[in-house]
Regions:
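Short acidic capping loops at alpha-helix termini that bridge into adjacent secondary structure
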Residues: 30, 80-84, 104-107, 151, ...
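Phosphate-binding glycine-rich loop
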Residues: 59-107, 125
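PLP-dependent aminotransferase class I/II
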Residues: 65, 213-290, 294-297
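PLP-dependent aminotransferase-like
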Residues: 100-157
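Active-site pre-lysine segment of PLP-dependent enzymes
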Residues: 141-150, 163-186, 190-221
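Conserved PLP-binding catalytic core of the aspartate aminotransferase-like
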Residues: 279, 288-322
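PLP-dependent enzyme catalytic core of the Aspartate aminotransferase-like
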Residues: 318-322, 330-365
Length: 365
């Protein structure tokens, strides 16, 4: 049996190392996972109650169109229901966009260090991929614009960018969109957007009326803490969403995911608590990296990329032995690790372990 030639080289996605694997392999009783940008304070109690209420109905297929959830979200966002599509996480929407729009004759543009699933799904469609280097950890919109040709079909912007955590401001984004040819679909991935406190951060959904070639992606995995439920959504002009819907698999969001997401949208107290906890954690980690003399990209999501001045996989392994899981191995940032914001206690334990490791390696005196 012969698979498609263009997928034979593709790596299998590697998530953050599971806690139980680390405990078993290293004989540790406590492990702190700061690798997958999860919500350290959990998820909404209203979502828990909603799932428990639904637990006896798992033998029945979910609403294939997510009608109730769509209505609640549309009201909250100020858009029409036909402008929304749900997926098994926002990564499912990425897959659908590639399936709906890209062929081997097309080109697609993205940053050279960004969320890996853009490139992965474009490669599955055998599309020609143009990777534009980041500039100071940010998307270089001028260079991306210069790379556009008549063959360019989709352009990807992760805002805040994963893994660097940097953002593109409102004026910069709008100036870019005004110059971009209208045949290019812009995927504006705002998976971490709810965490951003910078007043210049653009809400992509408010731009759709003026720029109907935008699709905005968001997720319930991050600030809402529903990572295990796998549910995210896209928002765009109705005809664009209809096109993406044409390639959506049936029943692609589960019953528990739908009711949990709906309840989460109605729990403003939990959302505010998640945001406040994250902001405090970012401020603490920024201050500690300053104290240690480490360079970093200011985090605007729920993670920070920090330069540890030594090969990052070595730091990863040493931190792992101390029961701290982070992410490392970035092609263009070989000396950087990405650490998720944890609870206050977890953040303190991470800094203590990192300082010990850097002193051990003589990176710090």
């Amino acid at each position: 049996m012969q698979p498609k030639v263009n997928i034979m080289h593709l790596p299998v996605y590697q998530p953050g190392k599971p806690i139980e694997d680390v405990k078993r392999e290293l004989g540790l009783d406590e492990v702190i996972k700061l690798a997958s940008n999860e919500n350290p304070i959990g998820y909404s109690p209203k979502a828990r109650a909603a799932m428990l209420d639904e637990i006896d109905h798992l033998h029945i297929y979910p609403d294939g169109a997510s009608v109730d959830l769509t209505a609640v979200l549309a009201s909250k966002l100020g858009v029409e229901s036909n402008q929304i599509i749900f997926g098994t996480g926002s990564s499912d929407i990425i897959l659908m966009i590639c399936r709906a729009y890209l062929t081997a004759a097309d080109e697609t543009i993205m940053a050279d260090e960004t969320f890996s699933q853009y490139k992965h799904n474009c490669e599955v469609e055998n599309t020609n991929i143009i990777e534009v280097p980041l500039k100071d950890g940010k998307h270089d919109l001028n260079a991306m614009l210069a790379a556009v040709t008549e063959r360019t079909k989709v352009l990807w912007i992760c805002n805040p960018n994963n893994p660097t955590g940097t953002i593109i401001g409102r004026e910069e984004l709008e100036a870019f969109l005004a110059k971009l040819p209208k045949h290019v679909l812009v995927v504006l991935d705002e998976a971490y957007g709810e965490y951003v406190t910078d007043p210049n951060f653009p809400n992509g959904i408010t731009l759709i009326d003026r720029y109907p070639n935008i699709v905005v992606l968001r997720t319930f995995s991050k600030v809402y803490g529903l990572a295990a439920n796998r549910i995210g959504y896209g928002v765009g002009e109705a005809s664009v969403i209809r096109t993406i819907n044409q390639v959506r698999e049936p029943f692609n969001t589960g019953r528990l995911a739908q009711v949990a997401a709906k309840a989460s949208l109605q729990d403003d107290e939990f959302l505010a608590r998640s945001q406040a906890s994250n902001t405090a954690g970012l401020n603490y980690l920024h201050a500690q990296f300053d104290r240690l003399g480490l360079q970093y990209f200011k985090g605007h999501g729920n993670f920070i990329m920090v330069d540890v001045r030594t090969p990052s996989m070595q730091i990863f392994d040493l931190l792992l032995r101390k029961g701290i899981i982070v992410r490392a191995g970035w092609k263009h940032y070989p000396n950087a690790i990405r650490v998720s914001v944890g609870t206050a206690e977890q953040n303190e334990k991470f800094i203590q372990a990192l300082e010990e490791v850097l002193i051990e390696l003589a990176v710090l005196q």
